[in-house]
Amino acid sequence: MTLSFPPAAWWGIMVAYPDLPGQTNKGVHMASQPFPELFQPGRIGEMTLRNRIVMPPMGTNFAEPDGSIGQRSIDYYEARARGGVGLVIVEVTGVELSRGKTIRRQIGIDDDKFVDGLSRLSEAIHRHGARSAIQIHHAGRLGHAVEPIAPSSVMLPPSHRTPREMTGGEIEEMIGRYAAGARRARLAGFDGVEIH
């Protein structure tokens, strides 16, 4: 089978390379600009973005062992904001770290103790003109807890265990955990929340 793709100019390829001595190209050059709207301000509800480039949430494993934000996380996200992204969405942030983690060093938002670090993170993103959102998350049946939980007891093959089906009360409690996570995100200065 042969795959064919449109010419690179159609994709709007961005090429990054170091400046040569005596040049002031800032290291990033557009090979073409077939989508000029991409670089225009955009809106999500009442929120205005400087452009329509969005960095999606991607798990980095950069959180501190207890789920707090350290300098490595701040540096990582600040670099993306400095690079010109319009909206930075911070990775999988646990609403229940004790039994809802997907990755070992996952950011936490299930306790007020995390708000200060998350505030420093949102401030670092905002400092460079980007907007910030945070993805709040519970692993459910994908969790690594002793007893994973989910709305139904359906296993995710091939390597996960069958989760315990949540009770109605546990589902209500989980809704409350997401609401509390969203409240903490707002207290920390994030412009939006993505529910995972």
Segments and roles (model prediction):
Residues 4-5:
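Serine residues within intrinsically disordered or low-complexity segments
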Residues 10-196:
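Flavin-dependent oxidoreductase catalytic cores
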